[in-house]
Amino acid sequence: MEIEKNYRINSLFAFYQPLLTAKQNNYMQLYYGDDYSLGEIAEEFNVSRQAVYDNLRRTEKILEDYEEKLHLYQEFTARNRQADEIQAYVATTYPHDSRLNRLVAGLENLEEQ
């Protein structure tokens, strides 16, 4: 369960990171991206572990609120599932249609940018 939560928070952070403050960005990057402990972050910023913990929880809530309103992550995952399904269908049904396969690959590349 913790792994899924971390994956979700990291994904939301990737989408909504520009909307966060510098402090929120720093704490999130260190904790989720660089695997710092609360104590290490607290020491780095000369604050208490509780302050770091509280900031991280508030930021997680903010990220979830953004997602609830904007649905960027949800729509991204839905598009990826659809693209995977299309790619599998084309590969199975039209394996020799090079133009169609290039078009599907082009769509996939757009999502990765």
Swiss-Prot record:
Q: This chain belongs to which protein, by name?
A: UPF0122 protein LVIS_0949
- What does this protein do, in the record's words? Might take part in the signal recognition particle (SRP) pathway. This is inferred from the conservation of its genetic proximity to ftsY/ffh. May be a regulatory protein.
Instruction: Note the Gene3D superfamilies from the entry.
Output: Winged helix-like DNA-binding domain superfamily/Winged helix DNA-binding domain
Q: Which domain of life is it from?
A: Bacteria
* Homology family: Belongs to the UPF0122 family.
Q: Which residues, if any, are the signal sequence?
A: none
The family database entries (NCBIfam families) matched by this protein are listed as:
PRK00118.1-4, PRK00118.1-6, YlxM
Protein source organism: Levilactobacillus brevis (strain ATCC 367 / BCRC 12310 / CIP 105137 / JCM 1170 / LMG 11437 / NCIMB 947 / NCTC 947) (Lactobacillus brevis)
